[in-house]
Each structure stands twice: as structure tokens, then as C-alpha cells.
């Protein structure tokens, strides 16, 4: 376990991607892979902002946010995300998060990862000076 001075709660999983801020989706065999398109189900975000993390093993080395806020790479422009604070997001190409339309959320709500929380203007975050790298804050479900 790690100290509780950070943003989200994470669990370690087996994944083919370890880059914080990327969306990875369940494969159905207890592993996760980088998202390749919009509206893939069972999406998760790799975290480098977690306060607590559980489940690390020799195989499970990727911290995935399960609650709280996490920095994620946006598919649409940061300006578009600023206009849509509070809206749901889903997976996008190349491990990004994408803004869901009302119809998509009604028809495929199970594809939602969380909601848009903030679009930071700062370059680093927290006492650990975590690089933001153009990411946005998502409140994960």
C-alpha cells in the first residue's frame, strides 16, 4: 500500500501497456490491452496519481484507477473537453478517452469509464511532480 495523499485508488493488473493516462480494456482472460477505438467496453485508465494500490504481483504490474480522479489522454481537443465538464467519457483510439454523446450514453452506457472533471493548465501535479503531458482529469466510476 501507498500513502493516501494522492488522488485515486488503484489495483494492479496484467496489461500489454504500462503508460500512465492510457485507456486499457478487459480482454476477458484477466488481462488488459490498449484501447483501439471508441466505445470499447470494460475500459480502465492506467494511473500514476494513486494514493492506495492493491494486488501487485510478479505479473500484475500496471496500476489501474478503480475510483477517484485520474489523468487521462484526450482524443478530442482540450478545448472540447473544457466545454464538456461533467460529461461521460469512453475509450478512444490509441488508449485515449473520448467524449460520449447523449445517445451513446443512453445506448451504450456500459462503455462509460467516468466523467470529465477538469482540464489542467499546469505542467506537473502533486508533491511527486507528476508530468501532466496534456492529460485531463477524469472521475472514474
Predicted regions and their residues:
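Extracellular receptor-binding modules and their adjoining Ser/Thr/Gly/Asp/Asn-rich linkers
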Residues: 1-141
Amino acid at each position: 500500500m501507498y500513502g493516501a495523499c494522492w488522488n485515486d485508488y488503484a489495483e494492479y493488473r496484467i496489461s500489454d501497456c504500462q503508460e500512465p493516462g492510457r485507456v486499457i480494456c478487459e480482454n476477458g482472460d484477466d488481462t488488459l490491452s490498449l484501447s483501439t477505438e471508441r466505445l470499447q467496453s470494460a475500459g480502465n485508465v492506467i494511473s500514476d496519481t494513486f494514493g492506495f494500490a492493491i494486488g501487485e504481483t510478479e505479473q500484475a504490474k500496471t496500476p489501474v484507477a478503480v475510483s477517484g480522479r485520474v489523468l487521462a489522454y484526450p482524443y478530442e481537443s482540450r478545448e472540447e473537453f473544457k466545454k464538456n465538464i461533467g460529461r461521460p467519457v469512453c475509450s478512444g483510439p490509441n488508449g485515449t478517452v473520448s467524449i460520449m454523446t447523449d445517445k451513446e450514453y443512453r445506448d451504450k452506457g456500459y462503455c462509460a469509464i467516468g466523467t470529465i472533471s477538469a482540464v489542467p493548465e499546469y505542467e506537473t501535479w502533486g508533491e511527486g511532480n507528476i508530468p501532466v503531458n496534456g492529460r485531463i482529469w477524469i472521475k472514474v466510476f
